[in-house]
Amino acid sequence: MAPEGDQRVGSGDSDFVVVANRLPIDMERLPDGSTSIKRSPGGLVTALEPLLRKRRGAWIGWAGIPDSPEDPIEEDGLQLYPVALSADDVADYYEGFSNATLWPLYHDLIVKPIYHRKWWDRYVEVNRRFAEATARAAAQGATVWVQDYQLQLVPKMLRMLRPDLTIGFFLHIPFPPVELFMQMPWRTEIIEGLLGADLVGFHLPGGAQNFLYLSRRLTGANTSRASVGVRSRFGEVQVGFRTVKVGAFPISIDSAELDSKARNRSVRQRAREIRNELGNPRKILLGVDRLDYTKGINVRLEAFSELLEDGRVDRNDTVLIQLATPSRERVESYIAMREDIERQVGHINGEFGDVGHPIVHYLHRPVPRDELIAFFVAADVMLVTPLRDGMNLVAKEYVACRSDLGGALVLSEFTGAAAELRQAYLANPHHLEGVKDAIEAALNQDPEEGRRRMRALRRQVLAHDVDRWARAFLDALADTKSA
């Protein structure tokens, strides 16, 4: 009798399978009980779509609503395989273990992680369902790319079900320092789960080095000890007769598309309208973030408030726009954070604004893509001040939209993007005076200096786009077959 894992071998017909927590669609349940589907835009699907079409690709993920049907979906020529999650699954696996345990742990304990055995058990169970769905969809010898922190056990589970597959894993958030990761009660299980992959990818070499050390310490595996480079000099972990490759692959954006859209006449016109609606201030500062405690929105608001109070920023000719996309609205800590931020906005406007002319313009709602690009075109200074961020693509999006416009980027040192965007005004978000100095320098920079810096930033962003990121990872993954 064949081993249980072998029963699924070759049962699917997809040569390339992407596995992510979410499908690239938004599903909505209508009043009559039926469902509607619309395409969800994103850099990952944009980068992988040509490959998905060319290689009979499939995407495994959750459709976004509890108890959604598991029938395969064909959406705009893409083959999608939903994994159904119940309301309890969402509460324990997603809102619980993924976002109240892993998220804060991997973001340097900005808030305290919560360790619940029930959440962990559900995380294991849901990861198993994703692995089984992938095993059913993948053709013999297929390539599988697993995405992000919600699915860290899938590589090992899938390896046991389908040893014929070539499996890659990429972590889109920071991988924490060793001493923080060691707090995790299920630390060994996570590392062993990731070691089921043939290639484990991180944004930065530091994350790869942390993973190599933990693999040695927690599993006793032999690992390489030389430093890991960006898209080069890979680390290795010996797992039985397999060699797992470990690398750094900084993710990026579809920079050419953004560059093109930002030059569009209607977008430029809308950017002028935004400036007019704000009273044609001399300088517009912009923040664009998901409403999350890692993003440092409160830091930039406090810095801006103190600059106004100190008279280092003229309240009569400077405005700040803060776009905050709703996020995890049922989680208590996020509700409290939103209230704190809105209180800060109210304080600044009450102290420094005038009737009909607030100095901070705050929007707590999603903004259409073309409108967002118009904001990027309108803004003189972009504020990106996370306390910790794996990469931060907003910083790169702003740069891609600036073409002939100059401008300035204030960027937290604790973003992955800071390693690439060296011509930004870098600041430590934990040092308020440093953030204030960076904002003031960006506001007062010489126009020619601004154009020089922006040209350098744009060379980096336009040359290293999301397509190059995906190709670099998949080329390295393909090389593991011949290793």
Curated annotation (Swiss-Prot):
Biological source species: Mycobacterium sp. (strain JLS)
Pathway participation: Glycan biosynthesis; trehalose biosynthesis
Keywords, comma-separated and alphabetical: Glycosyltransferase, Transferase
Positions marked as site (Involved in alpha anomer selectivity): W103, I173
Oligomeric and partner information: Homotetramer.
Known function: Probably involved in the osmoprotection via the biosynthesis of trehalose and in the production of glycogen and alpha-glucan via the TreS-Pep2 branch involved in the biosynthesis of maltose-1-phosphate (M1P). Catalyzes the transfer of glucose from UDP-glucose (UDP-Glc) to D-glucose 6-phosphate (Glc-6-P) to form trehalose-6-phosphate. Probably also able to use ADP-Glc, CDP-Glc, GDP-Glc and TDP-Glc as glucosyl donors.
GO molecular function, one term: alpha,alpha-trehalose-phosphate synthase (UDP-forming) activity
Entry similarity comment: Belongs to the glycosyltransferase 20 family.
Gene3D superfamilies linked: Glycogen Phosphorylase B
GO CC terms of this entry: cytosol
Record's protein name: Trehalose-6-phosphate synthase
Catalytic reactions on record: ADP-alpha-D-glucose + D-glucose 6-phosphate = alpha,alpha-trehalose 6-phosphate + ADP + H(+); CDP-alpha-D-glucose + D-glucose 6-phosphate = alpha,alpha-trehalose 6-phosphate + CDP + H(+); GDP-alpha-D-glucose + D-glucose 6-phosphate = alpha,alpha-trehalose 6-phosphate + GDP + H(+); TDP-alpha-D-glucose + D-glucose 6-phosphate = 5-methyl-UDP + alpha,alpha-trehalose 6-phosphate + H(+)
